[in-house]
């Protein structure tokens, strides 16, 4: 089978862009090589591997898991089914966090729900400081540690159920906790079917994890420290009420490129 023939079969199942992306991954070649040499033959192993990848994608498996990586904030992160796939909207959380740190400062930073480590590692590299990151999943932390080693980031990863194994206070606490309601029909659709449910959903309204974080965060924030949390597209008002109920003031709300509030932040009173 030639590259051109393999692509033609794959396009009928998963579309042209993904067919080319998976073929590049299998062959380790560029898009220009594929375009220039459609007559080039695949060996038996390559053809079998490519057919398997196409079948898995056609069944709905996320491209990021098939490739084993996903780009986030200009860097490639290893991903496996043990971690949530990094999303572009989470870059808003990183950008907001960076805006809270003055140039030259070396803040003490905590990331809640590390997953692949994309947020903690990005902050560590962008700020040039050490970051602590927690996750309840040992499997997720293994992926995060690999990413930190690969990218050269100073991150202390701790297996912890939110603040349970954490001592001390921080200048900046960030988190992308699960915020989808359990039973939400979207959880049975698309890529979400393959991602770790504990990283996606928590509680009947999706806010159970956030309530736990807000209950303990004041004990771990330095005076003047910031708490920044990503949340669902329709949870801005609920977040305002929860943050006010937890005694926080000076609420900030940050919108994504579509104008939707996706990050809420508060400052610990001096």
Predicted regions and their residues:
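Short alpha-helix
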Residues: 233-246
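Glycine-rich S-adenosyl-L-methionine
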Residues: 136-141, 189-222, 226, 231-234
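Conserved SAM/SAH cofactor-binding pocket of Class I
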Residues: 88-186, 192
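Residue-level signal for inorganic ion chemistry
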Residues: 22, 60, 90, 119, ...
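Core SAM-dependent methyltransferase catalytic element
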Residues: 246-270
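Non-catalytic nucleic-acid substrate-recognition regions in nucleic-acid-modifying enzymes
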Residues: 1-16
